[in-house]
Each structure stands twice: as C-alpha cells, then as structure tokens.
Amino acid sequence: MIIGIGNDLCNIERIQRSLDRFGERFEQRVFTPHEIAKARGRRRVAETYAKRFAAKEAMAKALGTGVPRAGVHWKHLGVINLPSGKPGFELTGGAAARLAKLTPPGHRAVVHLTLTDDHPWAEAQVIIEAIPVAEPS
C-alpha cells in the first residue's frame, strides 16, 4: 500500500545563485557530507544539488511534514546512490522517526525515488510503499 507520495520542482539557477551568494554556508546547512562530496566531484554542481534539493522537498511532502518542520530537517533527508546508480534515501533523526510512525505494524517501508533535470529545472518524485513483512513459517 502507498503511505506517502511527494514531488518537487527546483530551479537550478536558483540553486546556483544560492551557491554563489552563500557558498559553503548553504551547502553545510542543507546537504549531508556525502551529498557535498558527490556534488563537488561532478562537472554540473548546481544541477546535482538541485536534484537533491528537490528530492528532499519531495520526501518531506511524502512524509507529510514539509521541511524544516515536525522535527524533520534538511540533513535528516540524505540522498544516496545505490551501487546500481539508482537514487535512494538515508533517513536519520526526525525523518526516520516520522517514517517509522507512518509505517503500519507488520509492514516495512520501501522508498522509491526518481530524479531528473532539464535546465533550468530539476525534478524529484517520491513514493513511500508499505510492504507486509512475511511471518516466519
């Protein structure tokens, strides 16, 4: 069953302006060390950050909280890449607690994330699915 859905559209040029104006202060406030390292290692830094910013917003919407609200902060919503390259989340703090609260007993949460960009836009969609946990036989 679907227990949350969210999407967000982020202007890449707005992220670039934030980087130009606030630099490391902006990075440190919004992104995890892993996300910062990933973005700085890429040729298209603003696009990388914009997709992750959109993902954080989309996840916060799927959690039903917005950000920063209800104990969910930017850095609690870590965007990662699985070994396959597929994007995903590493939730901590208030975000992990909120997801646990949303997940029905006897279920586990699975988060689906997709990211795309087409200058000047970056977009993210999140679906949170609750899957029944198989009982041992």
From Swiss-Prot:
It is found in: Cytoplasm. Its EC number is 2.7.8.7. InterPro entries: 4-PPantetheinyl_Trfase_dom, 4-PPantetheinyl_Trfase_dom_sf, ACPS, Ppantetheine-prot_Trfase_dom. GO terms for biological process: fatty acid biosynthetic process. Disulfide bonds: none annotated. SUPFAM superfamilies: 4'-phosphopantetheinyl transferase. One of its GO terms (molecular function) is holo-[acyl-carrier-protein] synthase activity. GO terms for cellular component: cytoplasm. Keywords: Cytoplasm, Fatty acid biosynthesis, Fatty acid metabolism, Lipid biosynthesis, Lipid metabolism, Magnesium, Metal-binding, Transferase. Mg(2+) binds at D8, E57. Pfam families: ACPS. It catalyses: apo-[ACP] + CoA = holo-[ACP] + adenosine 3',5'-bisphosphate + H(+). Its cofactor is Mg(2+). Belongs to the P-Pant transferase superfamily. AcpS family. Transfers the 4'-phosphopantetheine moiety from coenzyme A to a Ser of acyl-carrier-protein. This is Holo-[acyl-carrier-protein] synthase. It comes from Hyphomonas neptunium (strain ATCC 15444).
